[in-house]
């Protein structure tokens, strides 16, 4: 079965009762103000068709979903060993902003999708790009075809004001020799990436290269190689949902990346890219209703990588 607008509307109707059972991220004040009732899903097929339902054109803070975009940029700038000697490829099983594991493993983050790993990627970008923030924005606008996409400066400033833990992570890595640039400018770039504002339609178009062997469906341009696409999807499948990655693989069965803004992207290699949004989170920091929507979609259309 293929996804249809009717099916997407049906799924949103089924998951809407979950709203009220999760919690909107409140440690970033600007995110705490997002209305909890928002709900959206968008599918972008490898034939270039958009199928959507709910608030699919409304932009929101993508937060950690941006980590997959930053890693994609880094993969185009560095040889594999230059990246993977500084950050691992294993699930962490710890909170996404944990310091304990980082200390025990001598400043090498478990994977590029927890905060420590994404901060290392931001450091890598700062070493090779004169204006990493502008480059990321241009990259996203190009892939989505939407020039209106921008950083939410209020969210970025809010995160910078509440950045003590992430700063501690960066300085701890620097103490182990795993940091090259000044900490504060790198953190500023990292928070701006998290503060990208995009809709589900924007996200589904942007990440279409992961469903199409590294070639953007929207622009028909190669973003990364087929091998890099396989590697990135593998990391998304094992590490993309914080310490809920196993649960997500079990229920949804697709490579994915979540953010505490309530968004999740999911990939069906060779077929489609999916984005969902519902701001209320489960205890792992993943969208509660969004995860359920992806689970139902996976079941109804019979798609899974397993």
Swiss-Prot record:
Gene from which the chain derives: glsA
Source species of the chain: Vibrio vulnificus (strain YJ016)
Superkingdom as given in the UniProt entry: Bacteria
InterPro entries per the UniProt record, alphabetical: Beta-lactam/transpept-like, Glutaminase
GO biological process: glutamate biosynthetic process; glutamine catabolic process
Family membership noted in the UniProt record: Belongs to the glutaminase family.
Protein name (Swiss-Prot/TrEMBL): Glutaminase
Catalytic activity annotation: L-glutamine + H2O = L-glutamate + NH4(+)
Enzyme Commission code(s) on record: 3.5.1.2
Upper taxonomic lineage: Bacteria, Pseudomonadati, Pseudomonadota, Gammaproteobacteria, Vibrionales
The protein's assembly and partners: Homotetramer.
Keywords: Hydrolase
